[in-house]
Amino acid sequence: MNPNQKIITIGSVSLTIATVCSLMQIAILATTVTLHFKQHECDSPASNQVMPCEPIIIERNITEIVYLNNTTIEKEICPEVVEYRNWSKPQCQITGFAPFSKDNSIRLSAGGDIWVTREPYVSCDPGKCYQFALGQGTTLDNKHSNGTIHDRIPHRTLLMNELGVPFHLGTKQVCVAWSSSSCHDGKAWLHVCVTGDDRNATASFIYDGRLVDSIGSWSQNILRTQESECVCINGTCTVVMTDGSASGRADTRILFIKEGKIVHISPLSGSAQHIEECSCYPRYPDVRCICRDNWKGSNRPVIDINMEDYSIDSSYVCSGLVGDTPRNDDSSSNSNCRDPNNERGNPGVKGWAFDNGDDVWMGRTISKDSRSGYETFKVIGGWSTPNSKSQVNRQVIVDNNNWSGYSGIFSVEGKSCINRCFYVELIRGRPQETRVWWTSNSIVVFCGTSGTYGTGSWPDGANINFMPI
């Protein structure tokens, strides 16, 4: 082989080897890119629903940049799936209640700009709990606080803060309302906000920050709602509303709302005679409410709401240790599970209870005559046995030397069960404390516990003599 042939042969071999190497490099690059995208690939969305990506879980759309052999490849990672809540887990088994939160609003008002409020409540989204209240359009150390004992004025708004944050000047005013309810369906907040003339009020339905629907007064006599959280199951929320006499026959309706739009309205049925200010909780697949009979009974009405067919039933808590105020002494109070007991039915106070098998957990003022003190306990057979009075696990939340007020329930979903929590409104000022011209409140919050617990009292704690008049 002459020199030229040798050079040509060596060149051909080198070119072949270079070509093979280039093809291998391209194959490796293609394989790497394919594997990378498959690792983060989203399944095809069904019904325009966003599906989760694995193994990366994020809350917002971001762009991931991957560098491979100096080549930049951009691929959008799918957002985390957001689902409606269904509350299908069992109820937590508890031994009692433990302290959770206290906002000290009145004490702080002695030296700071804190809203005048009443009708507080608590509700949680899937990640965080919030406190709500109806503001009076003024701070406490402000001449506008004079006369805030009145319930319904056009300046009242629904306030919303993270639980434990008092209603300071930076607090968001969610809507215009002198009666309200709020709940989170897993995707967004629903607020039911009632305001307007006593004889022709309007309820606005605000979902995800937008007004979606409304309804006007149907009995022209103070349309009103729960003053605590509503409940949403699989995207449908339900709220109890009443229009009519506060001390006689009224027209109660149960509304079903989907993403802010009213989809159905059911009339009250069953044996309950008067319904106001219900405290509702999920009892999958349905919803149960414990309410206030402001007409005939000091035993509390129960509403069972079927979320599938919109049917309604009602009755009364069986416990002979009744939950409303005013009420008879425990030795003479009664309840037959079906009817109001006709014992000091008027006026009443918002309260709560929840079933635990055949038993019932409940809270009430310690005083049988006024809104002072607060206690909780379980009544054995209190959900199933008429006039049951066997009380266990009693706790004092506020001693009887201090004022309480409204109370209500809210539910918190844990890893394995749904816990029941409650708040107590701690009212200060008028009508009981006439040294000042205002009426406002703070709150204390407890949640169910399966552990042990001690004793104490958690009143508002403000010295009325330190407060602005």
From Swiss-Prot:
State which residues carry a glycan (glycosylated). Answer: N61, N69, N70, N86, N146, N200, N234, N402
Q: Which GO terms describe its cellular component?
A: host cell plasma membrane; membrane; virion membrane
Q: How does it assemble?
A: Homotetramer.
Q: Which domain of life is it from?
A: Viruses
- Tell whether Acetylation is among the UniProt keywords: no
Report the family membership.
Answer: Belongs to the glycosyl hydrolase 34 family.
Residues bound to substrate = R118, R152, E276, E277, R292, R371
Q: What class of enzyme is it?
A: hydrolase
Q: Where is this region: Hypervariable stalk region?
A: 36-88
Q: Which cofactor(s) does the record list?
A: Ca(2+)
**What does UniProt list as catalytic?**
D151 (proton donor/acceptor), Y406 (nucleophile)
Q: State the organism of origin.
A: Influenza A virus (strain A/Leningrad/134/17/1957 H2N2)
Name the cystine pairs: C92-C417, C124-C129, C183-C230, C232-C237, C278-C291, C280-C289, C318-C337, C421-C447
Topological domain (Virion surface) residues are 30-469
Q: What is this protein called?
A: Neuraminidase
> What Gene3D superfamilies does the entry give?
2.120.10.10
Region: Disordered; residue ranges are 325-349
Chief site of localization: virion
The UniProt record's further free-text remark is:
The influenza A genome consist of 8 RNA segments. Genetic variation of hemagglutinin and/or neuraminidase genes results in the emergence of new influenza strains. The mechanism of variation can be the result of point mutations or the result of genetic reassortment between segments of two different strains.
Q: Which UniProt keywords apply?
A: Calcium, Disulfide bond, Glycoprotein, Glycosidase, Host cell membrane, Host membrane, Hydrolase, Membrane, Metal-binding, Signal-anchor, Transmembrane, Transmembrane helix, Virion
